[in-house]
Amino acid sequence: MSSDRIFIFDTTLRDGEQVPGCQLNTVEKIQVAKALEELGVDVIEAGFPVSSPGDFNSVVEISKAVTWPTICALTRAVERDIDVAAEALKYAKHKRIHTGIGTSDSHIRYKFNSTREEILERAVRAVKYAKKYVEDVEFYAEDAGRTDNEYLARVVEAAIRAGATVVNIPDTTGYCLPSEYAAKIKYLVDNVDGIDKAVISTHCHNDLGMATANTMSGLLAGARQCEVTVNGVGEHAGNTALEEIAMIIKSHSDIPLVTNINTTRITPVSRMVSNLMNMPVQANKAIVGRNAFAHSSGIHQDGVLKNVSTYEIIDPKEVGIDDNDIVLTARSGHAALKYRLEVLGIKMEGHKLDAFYDEFLKLADKKKQVSDDDLLVLAGADRAEDHHVKLEYLQVTSGKGLRPIASVGLDIAGEKFEAASRGNGPVDAAINALKIIIRRQMVIKEFTIQNITKGSDDVGKVHMQVEHDGHVYYGFGADTDIVTASVEAFIDCINKFRG
């Protein structure tokens, strides 16, 4: 293996999924894991098994479904955590336990009420215990970014002696400057006995907008694994974006580093994750934002028309953007639809494809041409098929000088309900009618509308945050009619608190 090979450790399904409203079910996690395998990631952190039965089951099922990437499970430096992680990983072809503890003075004092020596001993015990189950053990020094280098080196050296094969140096708070983070990695390379027996890993957060810069600085200083997420999803301001690291390394031929990433799968995987997590990608997001390869300035447009290299350093096709997309219409057949779905990373066969095709035709009759983004939205709506509460019909009457009135019909576990109500607008009227049926005090805390496609017949996607009985639920809906999309988003929230 080349010493310049960078291992891509994807934590979209663990760290990325901690974003409020972005939780996935097991089937969706398997779908993402398979897409990550096709993308070429080396390690998939599938979850934190001890945290919930759902996380445990997801790690088990992903271990069964994925073939060549290493499947990793997170633990604390607690024996029960490690026991549960090992059980969850029993079907994995290649398995890793990721255990560790906070090492900064802040964590030692306030989180653990402990001492440096006690933390070091707990770290060693955890690694040794994990080695009883698996050969591949990764140790993380949480908040390493704010841990002084001398103590950090002691902990890392002890972890390697105990058997750690990877040592993770997280900038947990996103505080480090790139020069500081690089110096920290270099200090470990130069001062830890046995550092050649383990891989140093970066794990950078984006609280100050430096996650990608810090990760690259760490790699250039000697780290050979980086922990990333698709689209940079993650708590707070997010994590290092996989697509940014992959394309920086590929674009800079003078950087002597390589990854195993199939970059032509970047855009399809980005769209899949965005759709499944209901997390829109900002338009100006590097590599995968919809404006990443757009040019509105006249000077830029003129240059690009003469030669694309004047303003574009990446060929869009390198990241999976195909200028020759098949145009889907109501006359498109099953084969064309199936092909387009597979390009987007969505696998459908048999009856499921037939049912999806019927929904596709309904949208195609409304829109004339159906885009990739439309298909992703439709696939997201298709996931609601097992919900207890379903919209049967919606009728709204409104106009200038009229107070809107909405009539709504719901199917709740097979039983039909109807209600009508007025409101301060068509959406308000429809939501009021829903509240009459469900008889719950649900307060909308956030309401955002995103245009998915262009044109007067575009699909609108509504993201909604609703509070009920002290708990917050997130929902989304999509339709060419924004009132219907809003109602579907509210119903999505209802299903989540009922489920």
Please provide the spans of the model-predicted regions:
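A mid-to-C-terminal "edge-of-domain" accessory segment
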Residues: R5-I6, T12, M247, S253-A420, ...
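Alpha/beta enzyme core
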Residues: I6-I8, Q18-V43, F56-A65, E79-I200, ...
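Short, small-residue-enriched loops and turns at beta-alpha junctions
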Residues: D15, V19-P20, F48-P53, S104-S106, ...
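Non-catalytic terminal/interface segments that mediate subunit docking, oligomerization
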Residues: Q18, Q23, Q31-V32, K368-A485
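Short beta-alpha connecting loops at secondary-structure transitions
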Residues: P170-T172, E227-E235, K250-T259, G320-I326, ...
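Catalytic alpha/beta core domains of metabolic enzymes, predominantly
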Residues: C176, A182-K306
